[in-house]
Amino acid sequence: LCQAFQGHGLGRYLMEQAIANEGLFYRLLYLQRSLTAASSLDDMLMRFHRWARDLGLAGASLRLFPDRWRLGAPSNHTHLALSRQSFEPLRIQRLGQEQHYLGPLNGPELLVVLPEAKAVGSVAMSMLGSDADLGVVLFTSRDASHYQQGQGTQLLHEIALMLPELLARWIERV
């Protein structure tokens, strides 16, 4: 089949896709190994951020809905809390019925999800968990055109499914 379409570049396209998928698989495997080896939540969050930086991104962040995780005192995880009420307008506007959003956020939206972030051009944002109700994971780029609608989200999806189990080592679910 590939030979029949080689004149049209299908063979080359399929090979490029296979190579790209293999690269994504190994990146995810490395991330999972690294996060599993973390000795604390802070260590895990630092490893996650460093992994994103190694990919050339500005960073990676997690925000959790406090009605799904025990984030209040005496825990020192309150900085991860994201008010569902504050997030809902952004979710409706940017995600709609989707689990992922890739593209820019405006100033007020950034203040909701990344209040301490500086120079964010675009984000890859995904709802956490299989029911998309645990919080949000965000990857940031300084480049406004780095993340755009229509880009693949498979790696983002797998990370959003993997993180809740790892987080549950340090934060109790409600």
Show where each model-derived region lies.
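Sensory-domain boundary capping and coupling elements
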Residues: 128-143
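Short hydrophobic beta-strand micro-motif common in sensory/regulatory domains
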Residues: 121-129
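Signal-transducing coupling segments at domain and membrane junctions
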Residues: 98-122
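Allosteric regulatory "coupling" segments in signal-transduction proteins
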Residues: 69-100
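Regulatory loop-to-helix N-cap segments in sensory/regulatory domains
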Residues: 141-157, 167-174
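Signal-transmission linkers at sensory-effector interfaces
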Residues: 1-34
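Helix-loop-beta substructure at the N-terminus of cytosolic sensory domains
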Residues: 37-76
